[in-house]
């Protein structure tokens, strides 16, 4: 696991119109989040905070249990989740893209399944409230409908009645 450092800084890159995380002299993470999506605090306090570091490590340790991703992928997922949680403005719910979950098994994990008219895919819940959850797309590309898609790690808010549990046999089939 890449250890968080007080030297890490969030960078608002006008050239790329993206939020970057400067990890060291040789490494930067380019997020899919555009500058207009960022909170004002991103511009005022660019340092990776203790709160950022704690959340990053919590997400990393949670995801490692699934044994689905290599350490570099875990780091990338965790850092993008941290950016969404602390650097993005609130996103509006766009639940109409997703089918309601009508099953009886409740979702108890933060890695969930969402199903659009075009496909099903895995998402990570970054923030949860009683009505809705902010999630990031874990697939390379997730087709919402014929015209719209989400790039990897793009955030979307959905009503909780759209959240499908990730079934254990699905997880085990990916591990094998």
Curated annotation (Swiss-Prot):
Keyword Cytoplasm carried by entry: yes
KW Cell division (keyword) present: yes
A GO CC term attached to the entry: cytoplasm
UniProt-listed InterPro entries: ZapC, ZapC_C, ZapC_N
Localization, UniProt: Cytoplasm
Pfam annotation, one family: ZapC_C
Listed transmembrane segments: none
Predominant location category: cytoplasm
Swiss-Prot/TrEMBL keywords: Cell cycle, Cell division, Cytoplasm, Septation
GO biological process, one term: division septum assembly
Function field: Contributes to the efficiency of the cell division process by stabilizing the polymeric form of the cell division protein FtsZ. Acts by promoting interactions between FtsZ protofilaments and suppressing the GTPase activity of FtsZ.
Similarity-based family: Belongs to the ZapC family.
Subunit architecture: Interacts directly with FtsZ.
Name of the protein in its database record: Cell division protein ZapC
Species name: Pseudoalteromonas translucida (strain TAC 125)
Annotated gene: zapC
């Amino acid at each position: 696991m890449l250890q968080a450092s007080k030297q890490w800084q969030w960078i608002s890159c006008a050239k790329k119109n993206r939020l970057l995380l400067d990890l060291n002299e040789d490494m930067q993470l380019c997020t899919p989040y555009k500058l207009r999506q960022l909170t004002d605090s991103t511009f005022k306090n660019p340092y990776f905070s203790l709160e950022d570091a704690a959340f990053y490590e919590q997400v990393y340790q949670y995801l490692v249990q699934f044994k689905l991703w290599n350490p570099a992928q875990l780091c990338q997922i965790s850092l993008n989740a941290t950016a969404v949680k602390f650097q993005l403005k609130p996103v509006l719910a766009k639940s109409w893209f997703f089918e309601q979950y009508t099953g009886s098994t409740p979702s108890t994990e933060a890695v969930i399944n969402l199903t659009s008219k075009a496909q099903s895919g895995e998402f990570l819940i970054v923030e949860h409230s009683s009505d809705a959850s902010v999630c990031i797309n874990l697939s390379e590309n997730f087709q919402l409908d014929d015209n719209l898609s989400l790039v990897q790690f793009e955030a979307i808010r959905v009503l909780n009645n759209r959240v499908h549990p990730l079934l254990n046999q699905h997880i085990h089939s990916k591990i094998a």
